[in-house]
């Protein structure tokens, strides 16, 4: 521990410091011959120099000032905004009749914020070999914390350290094995949004750090293949919802199956492109009650016993991205389609309900399309204008649910952006973010305007038809009828950011 502290302190003082890792001296012994029958002493003729372990301290000091014209779902006192909040004064529905709501919209309230919690500190290690591979490692943290506090309470973990990266990489000539915590498979280090806002393209761009085992291999001159298994160890970066087993972390652990992903990538000096997929298994519930006479689940009282159950939900999503780099521009495009994005600070989730006949729990995942693009002018090294555009669409459940198959009072939605309590769901979201980055040495200033428009509506399947009856199916798509109470929540955000890299 003392030695580690010495390394870290030396790195902070000198920024980059090299330490000698002591190893036993190896000798090549050669007999000098014999003189008068006496053997000459063995003389060492060569030594192997000690390996050098390099430790580099890096990071940046960052300060953000931001203004929002509307309240949002946000993180850490608004430093990271996700999407504009729905209206609180929607028209009042009575049967099939809508009447005006006289109240003000409580979410139509501006805010001005300041923060330095994105400041980052990291340590890179390397310079040694093992198992025939070059070994390197990274330990990275910031002051973003891991949870939000109640507004005005100071009860969150803002300003506290959180673990971002902690991994070891083993590099051979044509392959790499990485073990530890790093970016999720859909966050592409060589192709991610460079927004001034710390949201880094959330909720269009998947964002999270996950413990993983990742193996990459060159399969051609410009082609590589990556495969990995991973899991969750932080509720904020796990499937969102109110799980019977705890958090989304627990839901994956009880499934006893790791998430997995694979990508095929082409890359040369100017062009990068890849396609991939990811699978994830959850076990939202592990116990239930069962009637010993009827075999029906979910009962209470005499004749019902507790049973362990296996009710897994499997989700699948797909990825495609590309990046073009020239002397004048950098263009990026990234798209995902699938069913599992709340663990990436995204929207959507899954519906759960009890079968009306057997009482067993059933699950249906919601489908979603996410895409974003970014264009950066690189004509100048000092001033670089850019624009980010993101779009997402709620595609509804993979299979609609017949309302007759749902046991009364058991239908729920686990996720983000959809609520059975309010009967509301997101429809689509568009974000347009122009910015200008100013560079000078290790300093950067950025000014950005972010326009986010989220369309909300009542959930299709919960809206009465003209005769007052409810539809026979529910798919959690947004309603399209006039009485679906559509509302587009719009937020204008202006950000000013200062960064000093070291």
For each feature predicted by the language model, list its residue ranges.
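N-terminal periplasmic/intermembrane-space "pro-region" immediately following the signal or transit peptide
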Residues: 6-7, 11-76
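Outer membrane beta-barrel
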Residues: 48-79, 83, 87-99, 104-235, ...
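Transmembrane beta-barrel architecture of outer-membrane proteins
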Residues: 54, 115-120, 162-165, 208-212, ...
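Outer-membrane beta-barrel proteins
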Residues: 68-72, 148-150, 188-192, 234-239, ...
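Surface-exposed loop/turn segments flanking beta-strands in extracellular/periplasmic regions
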Residues: 78-94, 353-358, 409, 466-474, ...
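Extracellular loop and loop/strand-boundary signature of outer-membrane beta-barrel proteins
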Residues: 106-109, 151-154, 195-201, 239-250, ...
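Detector for outer-membrane/organellar transmembrane beta-barrel domains
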Residues: 267-426, 430
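Outer-membrane beta-barrel "beta-signal"
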Residues: 486-502
